[in-house]
Amino acid sequence: MSLPSSRAARVPGPSGSLCALLALLLLLTPPGPLASAGPVSAVLTELRCTCLRVTLRVNPKTIGKLQVFPAGPQCSKVEVVASLKNGKQVCLDPEAPFLKKVIQKILDSGNKKN
């Protein structure tokens, strides 16, 4: 049994004017957070852990700056990144006894200045 072509079922869907209105609204909507997020590469690097492997020991005299990144949704572990005076960056084990001593020395020297 076949239906005549004039009586074929019509598939319900949005009308042409509704589609045009939605397209116009989409074009007029500012991108919002995407515009202020910065380069795509910066966004992508924040979605994973920074440290893939850690260095067990570094001479404390070669450390120029220490950065501590707390655990969060992007990485489940605390990460410590040391910027060395020669320009290299290395990841350190936050549980290493030598690192705890280095951090304590930094905190103590900061307290002496105050």
From Swiss-Prot:
InterPro entries assigned to the protein according to its UniProt record, in alphabetical order: Chemokine_b/g/d, Chemokine_CXC, Chemokine_CXC_CS, Chemokine_IL8-like_dom, CXC_Chemokine_domain, Interleukin_8-like_sf
Superkingdom per UniProt: Eukaryota
GO cellular component: extracellular region; extracellular space
GO biological process: antibacterial innate immune response; antimicrobial humoral immune response mediated by antimicrobial peptide; cell-cell signaling; cellular response to lipopolysaccharide; chemokine-mediated signaling pathway; chemotaxis; inflammatory response; leukocyte homeostasis
Localization (cell): Secreted
GO-annotated molecular function: chemokine activity; CXCR chemokine receptor binding; heparin binding
Keyword tags: Antibiotic, Antimicrobial, Chemotaxis, Cytokine, Disulfide bond, Heparin-binding, Secreted, Signal
SUPFAM superfamilies the record matches: Interleukin 8-like chemokines
Disulfide bonds: C49-C75, C51-C91
A Pfam family that the UniProt record links to this protein: IL8
Signal peptide: 1-37
Function: Chemotactic for neutrophil granulocytes. Signals through binding and activation of its receptors (CXCR1 and CXCR2). In addition to its chemotactic and angiogenic properties, it has strong antibacterial activity against Gram-positive and Gram-negative bacteria (90-fold-higher when compared to CXCL5 and CXCL7).
The family this protein is said to belong to: Belongs to the intercrine alpha (chemokine CxC) family.
Protein's name according to its UniProt entry: C-X-C motif chemokine 6
Source species: Homo sapiens (Human)
Organism lineage: Eukaryota, Metazoa, Chordata, Craniata, Vertebrata
